[in-house]
Amino acid sequence: MNLTSVDPPEVIRFVRKNYPEVEMIKPKMSIYNMAVEKGILPTMRLRWCCAEYKETSGAGYITLIGVRKAESVRRSKREIVESMNANPKKRKQWNFDQFSEHEESLVQCMGNGKEKIVVSPILYWTDDDVWTFLKANNIKHCSLYDNGYRRIGCICCPMSSFKQKVREIKDYPHVKKNWIKVCAKVKEKGLESYGLSPDDMFDWWISGKSYKRWYAEKYLQQKFKFKDTTE
């Protein structure tokens, strides 16, 4: 299990308790320090966090993941078998039949240690399929699902909805504090901050909006005053 330093603690405890044989792979550098080093926080368009902590880890191996098409529009474009490359433009996709035809060449690709093969065996499963399978086989699940979470990933993931991120910073206030510290440091390094405080930089970041839209919604709308025309 690749840790990112922004994993929900409930997930880590669940894995350690129920799957003690799973190896916890700690990152060489926390995502906070990585953001400071890069001078920018991860965003929906600039998802360097995925490349650093998820996609390139495990190069040279076949990795099974639980991605499903029903989860999002982006994931609906995934295929059952994919080669993961650090460069998204060079990634390839196959179904099982195509993978069998190219298996020899794919193994050679994995052998160079620069790519990994990712297999999504439940890609076409629905939410009901997942829960039916878990209940039928008495497989335990993380408590976060019982607390209203539909999907679990990194806390404050840029790909999550704003509503999800607002809930997460309420549940995990330490993550918010850490990111605000990062905002202060990247501001010192010269990241364009439009004169915002680290707290406002964080609010802008989790909104996922452009600076103009975020600023207009947060500050300009508060300045509007409507003349009372009633007599």
Q: What residues fall within each predicted segment?
A:
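ATP-dependent adenylation/nucleotidyltransferase module used to activate substrates
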Residues: 1-136, 231
